[in-house]
Design a protein with these regions (language model features):
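N-terminal accessory scaffold of Fe(II)-dependent oxygenases
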Residues: 1-260, 270-340
Length: 340
C-alpha cells in the first residue's frame, strides 16, 4: 500500500505540474494550496446564494410541450426533478464504484489539453488529505468515456437521454464525426469550471448523480466575449470574481443529487462542487437553438457545417450571411471541451 501511495502521488504531481503550469505559473507541488482556499471552506462551500431563483419543475406534473413553450423555446433555464429517478446510475455511481470497475481507464482532465489520468490515481487524489487542500483541484471532464475500447463504456447503459432532450440535430453526423457532446464530470469539493458559454451554440442538460453543485448563470449578451473575463475556475472565481458581477442579473442555484439542469444556448455559467460530485451532461441542437449553432459553426467548423447542412436537407436552411446576427462568433468562442 505504501508503494502504491508513492507511485500514485508521484504520478499525480507529474500530471498536475503539466496542466497547472499555465494556470498557476507554478510547478512546485507544495505551492498548489498556498492561497489557502481550503481554510475558508465553511464560507466557500455554504448553501447561501445571491442571485435570482430558478424555476423548479417535475416530469411528473409537467408535460414536454409545457416545458418547451415555457423554457426551451424562451431560452430560460430551469431545474427538473424526476428525470433520473429510474436510472441505475443513481444507485451505483460513486467514486469508489468507478475505482472498482475502471481503475486503469484513463479519464480526460478538465482544462488540461486532453491530458489523461488513470482513474485509480484520480481516486487516490480525491481521497488524499494532502490534495484536498488544493486551491484548484483536479477535475475529470471526459468526452469519450463511451468509446468502444473503454471499460467505462458500460456507463452508457446506466443512464438514458431524457425524452425531453432526445432530439439532437447533430446526431445525423454520427458519433465519430459530430463535435463532442457528452461528458462524465467528476471532482472533489471546491473544484469547478470557469465562466464560459457552451460551444457551438448548443444547449445542454446536466444531471447530478452524486454530491452538490453550485451554478451561477448570466443571460446571453451579459458579456461581449470571454476575452474580457477572468477564467479562474471553481472556488477562485467565486471568491475573487463573483463580487464584481453581483449587480448584473443572474441566477444562483444549488443543484442536488438527482436534479437535472436545463441550460439554454448562450447562457454564461460557472460552477463549483460543494461536495465531491459526479454528473453526466449532454449538449444538443434542436429547432430552438439551431440558428445560433449555424452562426457559430460557419466560423468555427466550416467543413463540418456544410456537411451537416447537406445531411439535414430541408430540416434546416443553409445560411451564409452572419454580419447582422444577434450572437457574434466572438461570443460563441468557447472551446469544445468546457467543463461544468
Amino acid at each position: 500500500q505504501e508503494d502504491d501511495d508513492y507511485v500514485s502521488t508521484k504520478f499525480i504531481e507529474k500530471s498536475k505540474a503539466g496542466i497547472r503550469l499555465r494556470a498557476l505559473k507554478k510547478i512546485i507541488p507544495s505551492t498548489w494550496h498556498d492561497i489557502g482556499y481550503y481554510k475558508h471552506d465553511k464560507k466557500i462551500l455554504s448553501n447561501k446564494t445571491y442571485g435570482a431563483p430558478i424555476d423548479y419543475i417535475s416530469v411528473h406534473d409537467t408535460t414536454q410541450q409545457e416545458f418547451e413553450e415555457k423554457y426551451k423555446n424562451t431560452y430560460t433555464p430551469c431545474m427538473i426533478l424526476g428525470m433520473a429517478d429510474d436510472w441505475p446510475a443513481m444507485k451505483t455511481w460513486s467514486f469508489e464504484n468507478f475505482n472498482e470497475r475502471f481503475p486503469n481507464d484513463k479519464f480526460i482532465l478538465a482544462n488540461g489539453d486532453e491530458k489523461r489520468i488513470r482513474y485509480k490515481y484520480f481516486y487516490h487524489y480525491v481521497n488524499h488529505k494532502k490534495h484536498r487542500r488544493d486551491d484548484i483541484p483536479l477535475y475529470l471532464f471526459d468526452s469519450d468515456f463511451g468509446d468502444e475500447k473503454r471499460a467505462s463504456r458500460v456507463l452508457l447503459d446506466e443512464y438514458e437521454v431524457p425524452e425531453w432532450f432526445d432530439e439532437d440535430f447533430f446526431a445525423i453526423l454520427g458519433e465519430d464525426k459530430r463535435p463532442p457532446f457528452r461528458w462524465i464530470i467528476a471532482g472533489p469539493k471546491r473544484s469547478g469550471c470557469s465562466l464560459h458559454i457552451d460551444p457551438l451554440g448548443t444547449s445542454a442538460w446536466n444531471t447530478l448523480i452524486v454530491g452538490k453543485k453550485r451554478w451561477v448563470m448570466f443571460p446571453p449578451h451579459t458579456f461581449k466575449s470571454e476575452k474580457e473575463l477572468k477564467t479562474d475556475p471553481g472556488a477562485s472565481w467565486f471568491i475573487n470574481e463573483y463580487p464584481k458581477y453581483k449587480d448584473k442579473y443572474h441566477i444562483d442555484v444549488i443543484q442536488e443529487s438527482g436534479e437535472t439542469l436545463f441550460l439554454p444556448s448562450g447562457w454564461w455559467h460557472v460552477t463549483m462542487n460543494l461536495q465531491d460530485s459526479i454528473a453526466i451532461t449532454q449538449n444538443f441542437v434542436t429547432d430552438a437553438n439551431v440558428k445560433e449553432t449555424q452562426r457559430t459553426m460557419i466560423n468555427k467548423r466550416p467543413k463540418t457545417y456544410f456537411k451537416w447542412v447537406k445531411l439535414m436537407g430541408d430540416r434546416i436552411q443553409e445560411d451564409r450571411t452572419f454580419d447582422d446576427v444577434a450572437y457574434s462568433s466572438d461570443v460563441y468562442s468557447s472551446s469544445d471541451s468546457e467543463s461544468d
